[in-house]
């Protein structure tokens, strides 16, 4: 949903930022990762306060569960379209340190693939204050660099998916710290390798800090679900079933089939591979089969969670599912916000929110 705005922004900043080593970054004064999208997402405290009031007025019930999420899958689209799905899910992320696993929408333009992508910023901008980068970032990266991970501030700088989550994480915890990672194109086998390696790195770091999963650290992955229709998708026809009422209903049925078969219940390698079979072309993993933008981030996050779980499987619950044309559009124009794309029966996006524990 961000293609028009973010693509133009990407072209402007591409020449201004380059990959830098962790050592060089430490020698310089801390750099703040600036914002990509100030239209679809809130970036000021009063915007967030107003939005949360409006979400509650739509019937959202606050989640005070005693058992926090260890891993979640959250959308990253315009707040007016997603409504309360963000706080419904993220309020129950209680950890002080959050490993963010996001989409790398612009990776192909930079010819980046096959590696987890870290960054070297000193902090990220948040509505109330800058969001600190956890010291765990350097520790995790040190264990992964070369074979499984690389640095690219250029790619991280133009990516919007993780940015969408920060205002809500900071709303519920003003002192939250983050480790931002984005996932470009990679084969299903490579996703498994990277997820397993990330789990091993996390296990070492968690042991060093004496952290408890869910209490001290959590994994927050992001994807929007299907990007559907044949209108204003850059010339692409993504309406597999057509975009009349019958076609859209068939698309929703497939969405729930994917969620039920792959994402709900215990995390297993078989379910993760099945998710890839739904979303990736069998002959070329670079090509969409069903247009979930997190077709790489979700498997990596689930493999990481699977291999990190030492006692039993994590089990996933569907907290909510909606789309940009079925959910009430929360008013945002008076908040100096808006929308980055249209929402019509021939151009809509699905939103799946799942929590694991």
Say what each PLM segment does:
Residues 307-357:
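Long, Lys/Arg- and hydrophobic-enriched amphipathic alpha-helices
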Residues 5-14:
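Sec-dependent N-terminal signal peptides
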Residues 22-299, 303, 307, 312, ...:
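Active-site histidine-anchored catalytic micro-motif
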